[in-house]
């Protein structure tokens, strides 16, 4: 299956699950393919046949965009170089949760979250430590007896009760011993932070020198500018109170700029974010809801309210 067809299938599945899905980011470079929202859950999704193609640079950008846009970065893929992705298992690449289309369907359509995650050494399950401790006490089973039945140390059982994950085999054995479900789901929509290894966060990228004047204006009127390197927009800008966020683009106005502006509108609709594209000159006010502002006019803006009003007038005009 081509990657384009795979993206189409994932888009259709998300729409069936009640998500609003953006247009595909059909430009390069791109850190994500589509954005999607259902209620308060916002996703930035990268779709790959081979997840080994997902590099650290892209992972870093997706995590940053997730932070800026209050979204969860996810990768949906089919396989690694060596094997197919197992259903019901969450993998990780560069701090981003990864899983198969089957797992995505279980999660988003059936609302059955995955229970297993991959980590160095094998497959693991999150054990509900408090529940395990309560059941063991109710059954009047000592740490030592349970440890003997599992073939582990008393210290290891104590760690399970303190929240340490267990191998799939041990988790299954625990549930068989007590005849109770003890596994906790992997909270994928929260970034699976409870099981994800910490990753180093490189310094944020510098703005493109060509965008220096745009950054200067945004900073002057009270916005913090977060440059991007692999997105259809040049930056995510937010005011000091983090109440207003704006997807920001800049270039001469040509067919590529128009395409980027359309994608920005679509992504902004999903993330509930305004979008503005600064151009050298144009006779148009907007592209599908992305405001167009000429550079000279943009440089005359004095405060954030003026910018917000101008973006709204252009976008709605």
From Swiss-Prot:
Keyword Methyltransferase attached: no
Residues of the HTH cro/C1-type domain: 132-189
SUPFAM superfamilies listed in its UniProt record: lambda repressor-like DNA-binding domains
InterPro entries for the chain: Arc_TR_HTH, Cro/C1-type_HTH, Lambda_DNA-bd_dom_sf
Keywords, sorted A to Z: DNA-binding, Transcription, Transcription regulation
DNA-binding region: 143-162
A Pfam family hit: HTH_3
Record flagged with keyword Repeat: no
Molecular function in Gene Ontology: DNA binding; DNA-binding transcription factor activity
Protein's name in the database: Putative HTH-type transcriptional regulatory protein NP_1320A
Native source species: Natronomonas pharaonis (strain ATCC 35678 / DSM 2160 / CIP 103997 / JCM 8858 / NBRC 14720 / NCIMB 2260 / Gabara) (Halobacterium pharaonis)
């Amino acid at each position: 299956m081509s990657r384009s067809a795979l993206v189409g299938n994932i888009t259709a599945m998300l729409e069936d699950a009640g998500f609003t899905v953006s247009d595909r980011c059909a430009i390069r470079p791109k850190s994500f393919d589509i954005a999607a929202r259902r209620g308060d859950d916002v996703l930035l999704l990268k779709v790959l046949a081979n997840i080994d193609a997902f590099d650290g640079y892209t992972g870093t950008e997706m995590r940053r965009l997730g932070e800026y846009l209050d979204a969860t970065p996810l990768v949906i893929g089919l396989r690694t170089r060596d094997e197919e992705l197992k259903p019901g298992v969450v993998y990780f690449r560069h701090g981003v949760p990864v899983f198969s289309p089957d797992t995505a369907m279980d999660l988003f359509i059936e609302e059955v979250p995955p229970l297993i995650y991959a980590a160095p050494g094998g497959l693991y399950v999150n054990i509900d430590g408090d529940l395990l401790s309560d059941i063991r006490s109710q059954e009047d089973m000592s740490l030592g007896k349970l440890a003997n039945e599992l073939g582990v140390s008393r210290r290891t059982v104590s760690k399970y009760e303190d929240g340490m994950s267990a191998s799939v085999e041990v988790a299954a054995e625990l549930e068989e011993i007590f005849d109770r479900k003890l596994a906790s789901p992997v909270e994928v929509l929260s970034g699976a932070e409870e099981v994800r290894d910490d990753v180093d966060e490189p310094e944020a990228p510098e703005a493109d020198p060509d965008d220096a004047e745009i950054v200067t204006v945004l900073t002057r009127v009270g916005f913090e500018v977060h440059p991007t390197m692999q997105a259809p927009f040049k930056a995510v800008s937010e005011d000091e109170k983090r109440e207003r966020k704006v997807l920001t683009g800049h270039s001469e106005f040509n067919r590529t700029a128009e395409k980027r502006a359309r994608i920005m509108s679509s992504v902004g609709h999903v993330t509930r974010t305004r979008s503005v594209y600064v151009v050298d000159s144009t006779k148009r006010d907007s592209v599908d809801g992305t405001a167009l502002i000429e550079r000279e006019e943009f440089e005359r803006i004095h405060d954030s309210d003026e910018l917000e009003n101008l973006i709204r007038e252009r976008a709605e005009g």
